Design a protein with these regions (language model features):
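Conserved catalytic cores of phosphodiester-cleaving nucleases, focusing on short active-site segments
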Residues: 21, 40-61, 78
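Acidic-basic catalytic patches of nuclease active cores, encompassing PD-(D/E)XK
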Residues: 1-31
Length: 121
């Protein structure tokens, strides 16, 4: 069996995260929003705010928890893309926040989710 590409793994992680968020009653507004070179994995609404979600998945914690892979550069890019998303939809000033969904997906096991709300500002 061929090894999954980085993009395939990313899509799988985002599918899992979307299902997780929808199970909490959230509405998914957009996936993989790009502005210039900046990307937001998931844009959702949780009945209080627009939530920009960064998703990270690992097969184990051997090399650290998925959350540890959210770099300062990634945070800057999420801010940039989120500002563009809000501006394009004339939603400047609306409540918004930034969450991280970390997923541990061990082989032949159910995924383990770690959701940090308001993870960065």
């Amino acid at each position: 069996m061929a090894k999954k590409s980085h993009r395939e793994i990313g899509n799988e992680a985002e599918d899992l995260a979307c299902a997780y968020l929808e199970s909490k009653g959230w509405r998914i507004l957009e996936r993989n929003y790009f502005f210039e070179h900046a990307e937001v994995d998931i844009v959702a609404y949780d009945d209080k705010a627009i939530v920009f979600v960064e998703v990270k998945m690992r097969s184990s914690t051997k090399y650290g928890h998925p959350m540890e892979y959210v770099t300062e550069e990634k945070v800057k890019n999420v801010f940039k893309a989120s500002e563009a998303w809000m501006y394009e939809r004339k939603m400047d000033g609306s409540p918004m926040r930034f969450d991280i969904v970390g997923i541990i997906q061990k082989k032949n096991e159910a995924p383990e989710f770690n959701h940090i709300e308001d993870a960065f500002r």
